[in-house]
UniProtKB/Swiss-Prot annotation:
<dbReference type="GO" id="GO:0009279">
    <property type="term" value="C:cell outer membrane"/>
</dbReference>
<dbReference type="InterPro" id="IPR007543">
    <property type="entry name" value="LptD_C"/>
</dbReference>
<comment type="similarity">
    <text>Belongs to the LptD family.</text>
</comment>
<dbReference type="InterPro" id="IPR050218">
    <property type="entry name" value="LptD"/>
</dbReference>
<dbReference type="InterPro" id="IPR020889">
    <property type="entry name" value="LipoPS_assembly_LptD"/>
</dbReference>
<dbReference type="Pfam" id="PF04453">
    <property type="entry name" value="LptD"/>
</dbReference>
<protein>
    <recommendedName>
        <fullName>LPS-assembly protein LptD</fullName>
    </recommendedName>
</protein>
<dbReference type="GO" id="GO:0043165">
    <property type="term" value="P:Gram-negative-bacterium-type cell outer membrane assembly"/>
</dbReference>
<keyword id="KW-0732">Signal</keyword>
<keyword id="KW-0998">Cell outer membrane</keyword>
<keyword id="KW-0472">Membrane</keyword>
<dbReference type="GO" id="GO:1990351">
    <property type="term" value="C:transporter complex"/>
</dbReference>
<dbReference type="GO" id="GO:0015920">
    <property type="term" value="P:lipopolysaccharide transport"/>
</dbReference>
<feature type="signal peptide">
    <location>
        <begin position="1"/>
        <end position="29"/>
    </location>
</feature>
<comment type="subunit">
    <text>Component of the lipopolysaccharide transport and assembly complex. Interacts with LptE and LptA.</text>
</comment>
<comment type="function">
    <text>Together with LptE, is involved in the assembly of lipopolysaccharide (LPS) at the surface of the outer membrane.</text>
</comment>
């Protein structure tokens, strides 16, 4: 075996070999050290280089990968196996070598050329010492910094890392992103800079051509992180899908300007197509503009701007339809702006602005959940402070809030009061076992069609905390004072009114523990009784306006609430004792909670009650209904939760809910939930009052693999009182065996009104490390199917626990 080391301008030929048959060659090489030529013949030092094919591999979309190794890469380059050489030296090892020092060397048979981080294997190689250039064939493999190039012939400058190769297969991986290609020619223009001609490339594993981009030429510059393709076609399953004369794409996952993959869906409004263009304006600023069309409605334009700085960040969105053919309306739009600014460590400000062109916008373009959740659209500006003051902690805020209230299908609007402005503060200071504090709030309420005015709330209190490891007692004394200055409205005169109420409560509890065995192991079980006494005197409040108060629903948490109303305009009367007990089961080794259950009831010592209209009425009762809950997470496989409100006088449940979820592994989810309410709010009527009725709903959902690669996603939400489905969803998702691509198709039907439905069909296609086509399924599925994970995001092993 012959070897050659070079560091221009010196060429030194040496011979080394291992094995008994190499002794003669080594002796000859030693004798001819000063001779300008050296030669020898030994056995192979590397495996034969595989021939190059100008095909990326199989275009079969549904073929299985029996190897089970999606990232398998063929080992095609081997080094000499000898000690490292100094920087900028070149080492050549071959079966035979001849040539002239300082001029040119010819190496044949299992050639290995090594220089710095570059290794070349070839059948033969000519090394030009003066130009530091190597020419290699009939087959070669070149490895450098995570890039492997194989082909038939190569001309390559080792120092400048430039050259040209023919009939080339290239594989590269940087930063976890893989790229493979086959090309008629490949020009190497410097480190990490290539130009490929008549090429096909994708981001799949070796041998997988389920999809690829075919282009007349591609220039890729890893330093700039950009690739540019000319006359390119996207090919999926061997079928050309899309052509573009020019396209650029990121090589490193970083953002860059350019066309994004179109979005396509179909539904009650026909086929919708959107073609977004992304603008990478600065490292901290980008924008997206997406013109499109909605089949039965016409042209639509979407825009988004995002910005980010160390001290502020925000996003604005705009959707505009110049003319909606289906409704006949012009200039329909939706606008949003969210902004947050950290002025200092203690001072923050922000904006939350939302507006649509008309009340029917959400009904026409969104589902039932978005319709119900967007009746009053916020327009809010706020300023918050959190810091220290007078030896204690102070949290304060200033905000201005107005709403755009959307009318229901009957044309009725229930518009809340605007806050113009609201100033609030809360100060707390700990002194030993006691904490003193005061909460204050000033609000100017504004309304177009109701009496408005200003309200000042001042609530000083003192709390004590007597706690130890087995229990606690926490008394509290407070004085709630409210002052109103009301404006004249119609026949209502301007006036000033006030209300002052003392509030006394005592919260106490104990914790008992024992070690036992459950769920196949050691656990810690607790028993935690709790008593909460609350006293507020009865006082008529029907002369006070109701700007923002509403009733809270009765549940386990309400047993320990001071005021059963939200807001400050109504304060309930109270002389009651809440008694409850809960038990928890904790894993003895990790402390993880495995089970929790509780039950409680409230005992009344007087029958007075403050109604929502402010009047004081009588409710003959000595105790409340029972409320209870239970939840369990047995490992991460089973999740159970339930709650009930039981009317002991009528011996019936007022409402209850029970749910169960089984999640044995990623991509395996079964959910079931039933909800019942005897007298629930159903919808807002045209006269402004709510329609109450019985509510009985069953919600079933699942994600489950049908085969190794194919999964089903379903949801069925049925209303028993309405005697019809509220939402039905079914979909199928496929992930290729090597993870190179994934796809899904979904159909959905959901209620948008009392007698109206919407249908939708949408699909998604995910290409590994490149892009996605269509809607992101996670945008809808994680709400419809709790625990859902998109198929393309699942790990290679489906049996992994979540």
């Amino acid at each position: 075996m012959a070897r050659l080391f070079s560091l221009k301008p010196l060429v030194l030929a040496l011979g080394f070999c291992f094995g008994t048959h190499c002794a003669a060659a080594d002796a000859v090489a030693a004798e001819e050290t000063d001779n300008p030529t050296a030669g020898g013949s030994v056995r192979s030092v590397s495996e034969p280089i595989q021939p190059t094919s100008l095909s990326l591999g199989s275009t079969c979309l549904f073929c299985s990968n029996e190897s089970g190794s999606p990232e398998r890469t063929e080992a095609a380059v081997q080094g000499s196996g000898e000690a490292s050489i100094p920087e900028d030296y070149t080492r050549i090892v071959a079966d035979r070598m001849e040539g002239q020092s300082q001029v040119q060397v010819r190496a044949e048979g299992n050639v290995v050329v090594e220089r710095n981080r570059t290794t070349l294997n070839a059948d033969w190689a000519d090394y030009d010492q003066s130009g530091d250039t190597v020419t290699a064939g009939d087959r070669f493999a070149l490895q450098q910094d995570g890039t492997l190039i194989r082909g038939e012939t190569l001309t390559y400058n080792l120092e400048q890392q430039t050259g040209e190769a023919h009939n080339v297969r290239m594989e590269t991986e940087h930063g976890g992103r893989r790229l493979q290609s086959v090309s008629r020619t490949a020009e190497m223009l410097g480190e990490g800079h290539y130009k490929l001609t008549e090429t096909q490339f994708n981001t799949c594993s070796a041998g997988d051509a389920g999809w690829y981009v075919k282009a007349a030429s591609v220039e890729a510059d890893r330093e700039k992180g950009i690739g540019v393709a000319k006359h390119a076609a996207f090919v999926f399953g061997g079928v050309p899908i899309f052509y573009t004369p020019w396209a650029d794409f990121p090589l490193d996952g970083n953002r860059k300007s350019g066309l994004l993959v179109p979005s396509l869906s179909a539904g009650s409004d026909g086929v919708s197509l959107s073609v977004p263009y992304y603008f990478n304006l600065a490292p901290n600023l980008d924008a997206t503009f997406a013109p499109g069309v909605i089949g039965e409605r016409g042209a639509v334009f979407d825009g988004q701007v995002r910005y980010l700085r160390p001290d502020y960040a925000g996003q604005s969105d705009l959707t505009w339809l110049p003319h909606d053919k289906k409704s006949g309306r012009n200039n329909r739009y939706q606008a949003k702006w969210q902004h947050r600014h950290d002025i200092s460590d203690t001072l923050q400000a922000g904006v939350d602005f939302n507006q649509v062109s008309d009340s029917g916008y959400y009904r026409d373009f969104y589902g039932n959940k978005e319709i119900a959740g967007n009746v009053n659209l916020n327009r809010r500006v706020w300023l918050d402070y959190g810091g220290r003051a007078a030896g204690g902690s102070l949290n304060a805020g200033l905000s201005v809030l107005k709403y755009q209230t959307l009318a229901n299908q009957s044309g009725y609007k229930d518009k809340p009061y605007a806050l113009m402005p609201r100033l609030s503060a809360d100060w707390r200071k700990n002194t030993g076992r006691a904490q003193i504090g005061v909460s204050a709030q000033f609000t100017r309420f504004s309304h177009d069609s109701r009496q408005d005015g200003s309200r000042l709330v001042v609530y000083p209190d003192i709390k004590w905390d007597f706690s130890n490891s087995w229990g606690y007692v926490r008394p509290k004394l407070g004085l709630h004072a409210t002052y109103y200055s009301l404006n004249r409205f119609g026949s209502q005169e301007a006036r000033r009114v006030s209300r002052t109420l003392p509030i006394v409560n005592i919260d106490s509890g104990m914790t008992f523990e024992r070690n036992t065995r459950m769920f196949g192991g050691g656990v810690l079980q607790t028993l935690e009784p709790r008593l909460f006494y609350n006293y507020i005197p009865a006082k008529s409040q029907n002369d006070l306006p109701n700007f923002d108060s509403s009733e809270s629903s009765f549940g386990y948490g309400q047993l320990f609430r001071e005021n059963l109303y939200y807001g400050n305009d109504r304060i309930n009367t109270a002389n009651s004792l809440s008694a409850a007990v809960q038990s928890r089961i904790l894993d003895g080794a990790t402390g993880e909670e495995r089970f929790r259950a509780g039950i409680g009831q409230k005992f009344y010592f007087k029958n007075d009650a403050v109604m929502l209209d402010g009047s004081v009425g009588k409710k003959p009762r000595s105790r409340s209904d029972w409320v209870a809950f239970a939840s369990s997470g047995i490992g991460s496989r089973f999740i159970l939760d339930s709650s009930i409100h039981y009317n002991q006088n009528d011996k019936r449940a007022e409402n209850y809910a029970v749910g169960a979820s089984y999640r044995p592994a990623q991509g395996k989810v079964l959910n079931a939930r039933y909800k019942y309410g005897r007298n629930e709010k159903i919808y807002l009527k045209s006269d402004g009052s709510y329609f109450y009725d019985k509510l009985s709903q069953l919600d079933l959902s699942a994600q489950w693999p049908l085969t190794r690669n194919l999964s089903a996603v379903v949801r069925y939400n049925y209303g028993f009182e309405a005697k019809k489905p509220i939402e039905v969803l079914a979909g199928a998702e496929y992930k290729s065996s090597c993870g190179c691509w994934g796809a899904g198709v979904y159909a959905q039907r959901y209620v948008t009104g009392e007698n109206t439905y919407k249908n939708a069909v949408f699909f998604s296609l995910q290409l590994k490390d490149l892009s996605s086509v269509g809607r992101n399924p996670a945008d809808r599925m994680d709400v419809a199917v709790p625990g859902y994970i998109p198929a393309h995001s699942l790990s290679a092993g489906r049996n992994k626990r979540p």
